[in-house]
Amino acid sequence: MKLLNVINFVFLMFVSSSSFAQVIEMNNSPLRDFVTWYSKQSGESVIVSPDVKGTVTVYSSDVKPENLRNFFISVLRANNFDMVGSIPSIIQKYNPNNQDYIDELPSSDNQEYDDNSAPSGGFFVPQNDNVTQTFKINNVRAKDLIRVVELFVKSNTSKSSNVLSIDGSNLLVVSAPKDILDNLPQFLSTVDLPTDQILIEGLIFEVQQGDALDFSFAAGSQRGTVAGGVNTDRLTSVLSSAGGSFGIFNGDVLGLSVRALKTNSHSKILSVPRILTLSGQKGSISVGQNVPFITGRVTGESANVNNPFQTIERQNVGISMSVFPVAMAGGNIVLDITSKADSLSSSTQASDVITNQRSIATTVNLRDGQTLLLGGLTDYKNTSQDSGVPFLSKIPLIGLLFSSRSDSNEESTLYVLVKATIVRAL
């Protein structure tokens, strides 16, 4: 008898707890699934308008029956929907001019973040004394602030908390004690700031060794500083001097240098990349070929197989540039730059493809609008060419009289000009 009483008591406790709390966890679930859940839990008939589409993300471990309707309406309004009428209620897109909306939810004393904060999408869900609220992020991506906000919340409380982002509306959803949420808008105002963009203009070119380029009209009046503190009045002297392959210049050196290179038959422009990227974000551009390289081979003789095969791996071969700029408050730009100029070799000595590689990777500090010169990567090419009179050059001994062979050595040096300009945020 006592055992039966204990079982009944446990059963009543389970039923009681189930009737007073509802658990819901939805991550990017269809809105109609959320409506179906509410209809089953509340027993209320709901009509969904055909234009109601989208997804919702909701986490709550304690929604009491008396708060279920308000909780449901809060989530709808956070996603720009609302309920109209009653028995049955109709869910449709939010229209502030519609007078048939149900009564407003109980007002809360949430602190707003500027003028575009959570009231348009904020809602409260009791969860171990935590409050859940949304915050509108105006200048950066909400997901980029998740780790920063988590650090702020965890450094101010030892209680459990959670921070999520809604990418479509650029919202942060924060579940934390109410006193933490009251201070969060002030903290967000220090990190939700407009981000500058940086325009990277490049010029990748090569010059045959020993040829002097006339950059006098392109950079004759542009004064620069070469590595080591040596001043120069002309870009020409930098390119022509021994080891002079590094310099920083002011003015429009880049644009005028393109014109100078086009008029010289011994120079070759490989690429003129233009990259616009946010400060603190990586940008890259490349052009070339996707070349297959043999990484393994299985033949019938060596492996005793009926179907010999070989494995390949494709790699990009061509011209590429990647940058990672950061705009500083004083107008300086810290720039990580990597530039590559790869090409396929014409050599037939190897059984597979041979590539020629030339690359530069460095980190520099430039002023806004300055142009950086990098270079000194020399490539040596040795070519041999046989020619002769058809048929006669193949005759033994005397065939040498009707044939000739020429050898040539070519040297070319790769240079990279990079100009960085800050595009201020509006």
Swiss-Prot record:
Assembly, in brief, is: Homomultimer. The channel is composed of 14 G4P subunits that confer a barrel-like structure. Interacts with G1P; this interaction results in a complex that spans the inner an outer host membranes.
One Pfam entry for this protein is Secretin_N
Could you name the domain of life of the organism this protein comes from?
Answer: Viruses
Query: Which source organism?
Result: Enterobacteria phage M13 (Bacteriophage M13)
Question: What membrane topology does this protein have?
Answer: Single-pass type I membrane protein
Protein family membership: Belongs to the inovirus G4P protein family.
The protein's name is Virion export protein
Transmembrane regions listed in the UniProt entry: 317-337
